[in-house]
Amino acid sequence: MDTFDIQAYVRRSRALDLRGIEWDAVPRHRLPDEAVRTLRYMQDIESHTIIYLRTLLSTRAVDDPDVAAFLACWVYEETHHGRALAQFLHAAGHETFDRPARSRVPLGEALRARLTSVVARAWPDFVAVHMTWGAINELTTYLGYQRLAQLAGHPVLAEILARIMRDEMRHFSFYYHEAEKRLVRPTTARIARALVDRFWAPVGSAEQPLEETRFLATYLFSGPAGRAAARRVDEKIRRLPGFAGVALVEAWIDGMPRDEPAPRQVAYHPIGAPALARARVAR
């Protein structure tokens, strides 16, 4: 089992380094419309990472000092990813659309968050689910950025994404190490696997319109190279205890509705806390 040096990570954590980025060169290179649409989706999600912490912060996850330290750095870094993507879009002459963070949570969502908190505190190993969920989403995000850089063919964007990806890989390493460590108990692994099988959907799919999620999946993960990226996620997660044979990203893409929106069902919160989301587009 690999180790993760949380102290080294905390010491290195900082806002995304954008020194040397040639912002003046951004408009000199063509940026495909598909890349603009994808960037807006990603920028919105990165900028609202703080929202995803609401439920998580009420669980046992933050009782672990390593997890608490990581999350403080994680949300700071992710927020700066969103700012960097917004700055790039503006430099390219494109607007970003602000989605204000809600100060008041709807009653139904608040009740679901409370239920999650109660369940998580009653079952100490629930943190394993959070960590597994985070590993899946961070690796998917990393590979999504890699695909976007390849497809967009914009040299300045490629440099910005490369810097973001270094952060995302560190995030993935932490989540994966923690999941691997916590899933060694067969009962924990079995329950975590059942929850992932039943509820997983990519980050943002509960917040973004279905057509945007569908577009993102098609643009980034179709074709031989896209499918290979999707398989990399599944193959890595299958190495976790209890997750042999799990079908995640490819199964999600194959099961996504092409024409009509999916009915509103139970989904899983992007950070790993169970919640009723707007639409379950997985399967």
Where in the sequence are the language-model features?
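Non-heme di-metal
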Residues: 1-283
